[in-house]
Amino acid sequence: MKRLILASVFALGFVGSASAQTADSSPITETIKNQIEAFKMDDFARAFEYASPNIRGLFGTPERFGMMVQNGYPMVWRPADVEFLSLRQRMGRIVQRVQIRDAQGELHQLDYFMIRTGDTWHINGVQMVRIPGVGA
């Protein structure tokens, strides 16, 4: 249920796409990499730190957040391979597309919605993206 709510909240209004020339991809990709590394070690408290204040407020505890990721985004919890694709700006929001190969070899693409809090980038939501020609 939380996954559906989370995906719905962040899927609304993301229609247009433009180049994200104002964003530096390095701190953004490091944030995502660090969260994925924390998930791989089952360090949900550390993974929770990379979530935005809104997401932390939605889930309340690292344990509930970790459970949501394990159940709703298992490819993020235990990826076999992670590749960073395009960084862009949509409707004024910074979106990093990530391709993940899961333990069974299946490819998944996800859009990570990023926000800057002070000098730090945080993950403000993740939405799965349909890959053309896969699973059709």
Label every model-predicted segment.
Residues 11, 54, 130:
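Residue-level detector of flexible, active-site-proximal loop/helix-junction positions
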Residues 1-4:
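Positively charged n-region of N-terminal signal peptides that target proteins for export
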